[in-house]
């Protein structure tokens, strides 16, 4: 996937991913106390995900990256790929498990005019991925896999009762044991009530701090006078304990990204 255009074939996507990941590595080398890498994958519509395993391994073993971004829909809104629980994804999951790295589930741009990228496609993908995990048995086969679903988990926290009920109707185990040992949400939610709901519904151990500043939604909220995407402020103001806040800001990430934890320990942190 190239930027927002989805241009090029498998060879172009592979070259572009390598170039982007190498650029990330340059930034890390310039600011090693501030950044660590998570890699882009050379996913293309119709190309087996197993072809991305080599770039993941290169980034982790050679560049020192600690995870990857995984798109459940390389087609850009047409959903031509199999569900994330399908065995066609397993070769890549085997590499994730071997390297002990998590993946953030995140689509690229929308190539479907029905779905605005930021306002619809992203949230659709977050929610769809979670439902796929409910329907499948992926974590029985890969009990150590870890996925982060961004944007507060899409629509999931707001409809938590729906998903609990669907799991029951589909004769799936309860969500805490079936999905939530392996799936985490971030805090990229752009208003205080949304963050408050996330903390009320989802266990604190499943929430990682996330920020999209200089990212998806710019501008100052006229109701607060602060930037919409200043997500740290929402976490700071949430009615949670200092210990839980520390989990969100640091400890949960160190647990989900063990290679990050190892780097920080080497720094004496």
Give residue spans per PLM region.
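Mid-to-C-terminal alpha-helical segments outside catalytic/metal-binding sites
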Residues: 22-30, 54-58, 66, 185, ...
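Short, catalytically relevant binding-site loops at active-site mouths
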Residues: 75, 109-111, 153-157, 191
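Active-site gating/metal-coordination segments in enzymes
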Residues: 1-132
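Active-site gating loops and adjacent loop-to-helix segments of metal-dependent hydrolytic enzymes
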Residues: 5-11, 110-126, 163-182, 227-232
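Glycine-enriched alpha-helix->loop->beta-strand junction motifs that scaffold or abut catalytic
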Residues: 63-66, 98-102, 118, 142-145, ...
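Hydrophobic faces of well-ordered beta-strands that scaffold small-molecule active sites
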Residues: 36-39, 68-70, 103-105, 147-149, ...
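Aromatic-lined glycan-binding groove of carbohydrate-active enzymes
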Residues: 134-180
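Proline-centered flexible-loop/turn and helix-kink motifs
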Residues: 32-33, 64, 91, 140-144, ...
